[in-house]
Each structure stands twice: as C-alpha cells, then as structure tokens.
C-alpha cells in the first residue's frame, strides 16, 4: 500500500514539476522576447541619433564591438550600403524585404522572419532616415522549443534532487 502511495505521489510530483516548468518556460520566453524587441527598437533610435550627429561614418566595423545586433543601412532603391554581419557587395537587393517596404511607407516598421544571413528567425526593426535611406537593426530570436531544450538539463537536475531523497527514504524504511 505504501509503495503504491509513494509511486502515485512521485508521479504527481513529476507531473507538477513538468507543468510548472513548461508554464515558466512560456512566460519567460514571452518576457525575454518582449525585452529583446524593445532593446532593438531603442538601439535603432540610438544609432539614428548618432548618424544624425556623425553621418554614415558612424557605421564602421567598430560598431560590431559594441552591438550584438545586425545593423544594415539600405539605400532607397534597396541596395545595401552597410551591414555589420556581411559584406554589402555579397548581399542581394533588400527592396523586397517586408520591413524595408513598410519603413518606406510608414517611416518605421518591424517584422519577424527567417534571415538567410543568420539562418535563423530574426526580429527586424527598420526606420526611414531623413536622407531617404533605411536603417535596419535585427536580432535573432530563439524559438520556444530551443529555449525549452536548453533548460532540460536544469529540469533533470531538479527532478533528481526531488526523487533521490524520496527514493532513498522509501528504500531505507522498514516494511511493516
């Protein structure tokens, strides 16, 4: 009888831990994604201010040392003038990118889509500059699945910490 109760209790504990872990992962992913997007928008605004002050010369290779985001300057016709991650000469015309098209129309835009350069889902924020060019800042977005997988080791350790004492107690208790 005690074995059966302990077995059911262990299953309930494992189930509760898994449900809590999944719920916490979803909430954490959502919050981190929101903070990342806000950070990209703010970074784009800071770069715009610096470009107003220093011109396009602000966009140098040194920008990579202070920013983990991908920064791209795109001419009105879609030609890439600067990219912090790839040579502009190797990049295709960006006039068909959704964030570029919307920034041209509305002054600013954002999109989440697959990036050929990063080979990952990427959040882009684009701003139309006074000279007609478009500044685009992008950051890769981990999927909730990859976030969950990377946390599985921690979950496994926590489950061991819970199950070992329960199992030890069960094995060392005298049976009556």
Language model regions located:
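Short, conserved loop/turn and helix-capping segments at secondary-structure boundaries
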Residues: 41, 93-97, 151
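Juxtamembrane segments flanking the first transmembrane helix
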Residues: 1-80, 85-91, 146
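Conserved small/polar residues in nucleotide/adenosyl-binding loops
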Residues: 169-175
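Selective recognition of signaling/oligomerization transmembrane alpha-helices
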Residues: 150-168
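Structured catalytic cores of enzymes that bind and process phosphorylated ligands/cofactors
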Residues: 70-72, 122-129, 138-140
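Helix-start (N-cap) segments at beta->loop->alpha junctions
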Residues: 49-52, 130-155
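Membrane-proximal, non-catalytic sensory/regulatory domains of signal-transducing membrane proteins
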Residues: 53, 90-131
